Amino acid sequence: MTTPLADFLRTYAASGMARLHMPGHKGRGPLGCEAWDLTEISGADSLYEAAGVIARSEENAAALFGSAATFYSTEGSTQCVKAMLFLALQNRPAGTPPVVLAARNVHKSFVHAAALLDFEPLWLWPEEGTSSLCACPVAAEGLDRALSALDAPPAAVYITSPDYLGNMADIPAPVSYTHLTL
């Protein structure tokens, strides 16, 4: 597998070219990685309109992950969570309220998205006997109860996996149930 983005950065960093562009550190600094810190300059591609080295790198990542597509983002997973919820809310049936069912151990970016996008999170509480809010396994039965209590389908069901303790959720069960029910 090729490494188009890393290859470009390595070549640019070694070129000795005058950096008359952002960022202001000009490729120098105490960490040693600043030479690889670039903005959208000629050849570096654009994160939001990838057509060159970033696009090829994303294609490689998708092949590695076995996914149909992979997109890099800024802000870590925070921006991805916000974008995902925005799209889910845009695709909900007309006239349905902006509701998202969510396990109680969501990242704070989910809560920020709820405020920014003006939707109401309805919490999926952990099953009896769960000793921590960091571990919030969502069983199909709990999801069934939550869905049954709604007047209309939610825009999305949001489950954090792995959780903050490293536990993996049984994603296939609630996904299968949700697809059958909604």
Regions found by a protein language model. Name each.
Residues 1-52:
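N-terminal "arm"/small-domain region of PLP-dependent enzymes with the aminotransferase-like
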Residues 102-119:
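Substrate-binding/gating loop at the entrance of the active-site cleft, primarily
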Residues 119-173:
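PLP-dependent aminotransferase-class I/II
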Residues 177-182:
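Conserved small/polar residues in nucleotide/adenosyl-binding loops
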Residues 34-79:
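Conserved N-terminal alpha-helix of the aminotransferase class I/II PLP-enzyme fold
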Residues 54, 75-80, 106-108, 163-167:
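Gly/Ser/Thr-rich loops at beta-strand to alpha-helix junctions
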Residues 69-95, 109-113:
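Conserved beta-loop-alpha segment that forms the PLP phosphate-binding cup at the N-terminus of a helix
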